[in-house]
């Protein structure tokens, strides 16, 4: 149903094998991008509702999750679901000066004033190493590529992402928001 090989799906849907359901499968992307955009800032509170909409198909893990990250000045909402009718990889960013709607990897809408309305934007293509994690690993090992701290691929960023997802899992289990001091030092 979600387009994975049987081998990957069996891992993805088994918490003992470290598959974590939709929470970790899709939640990691939102946490990663938020951490990158906020330059490594950690959330003050993490809330999470993780549920099973299709328990017969995914009996051991969640398949529909909402994670809310509360920061000092903003809030990030991550919808991680295997239950949408079609493939979605979109993002909306709302700010005091307008919004950005990232429809997909190459189509964006921007609005800064209602009078001028929505403008379309095509972002620059990403580099080859950003498309291919094995290429990136090769460049780090053999070509001394430096990964910027808090960049999307950095250890710093991904440690924060792991902590966010751990807190989200615990928040869902306890059915209550968890404060930063539960996991971030």
Functional labels for PLM-detected ranges:
Residues 26-29, 129-132, 156-160:
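A generic structural signal for residues located within well-ordered alpha-helices
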Residues 30-33, 133-137:
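Hydrophobic alpha-helical segments typical of transmembrane helices
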Residues 20-22, 122-124, 147-155:
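Active-site rim elements
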Residues 136-185:
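C-terminal helix-rich "cap/oligomerization" subdomain common to oxidoreductases
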Residues 37-41, 96-100, 140, 168-172:
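Phosphate/oxyanion-binding loops and surfaces in catalytic or ligand/nucleic-acid-binding neighborhoods
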Residues 1-58, 175:
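Predominantly a Rossmann-like dinucleotide-binding segment in NAD(P)-dependent oxidoreductases
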Residues 50-51, 55-65, 71-136, 151:
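NAD(P)-dinucleotide binding in Rossmann-like oxidoreductases
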Residues 41-42, 117, 145-147:
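Short, solvent-exposed loop/turn segments that connect beta-strands within catalytic domains
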């Amino acid at each position: 149903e979600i387009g994975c090989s049987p081998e990957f799906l069996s891992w993805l849907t088994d918490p003992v094998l470290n598959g974590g359901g939709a929470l970790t499968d899709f939640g990691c992307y939102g946490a990663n991008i938020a951490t990158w955009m906020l330059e490594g800032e950690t959330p003050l509170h993490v809330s999470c509702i993780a549920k099973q909409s299709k328990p017969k198909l995914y009996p051991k893990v969640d398949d529909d999750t909402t994670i809310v990250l509360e920061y000092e000045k903003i809030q990030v909402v991550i919808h991680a679901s295997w239950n949408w009718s079609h493939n979605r990889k979109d993002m909306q960013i709302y700010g005091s000066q307008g919004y950005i709607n990232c429809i997909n990897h190459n189509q964006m809408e921007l609005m800064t004033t209602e009078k001028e309305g929505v403008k379309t934007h095509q972002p620059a293509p990403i580099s080859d190493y950003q498309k291919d994690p094995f290429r990136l690993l090769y460049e780090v090992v053999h070509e001394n590529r430096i990964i910027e701290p808090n960049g999307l691929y950095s250890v710093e960023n991904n440690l924060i992402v792991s902590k966010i997802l751990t807190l989200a899992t615990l928040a869902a289990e306890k059915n209550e928001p968890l404060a930063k001091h539960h996991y971030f030092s």
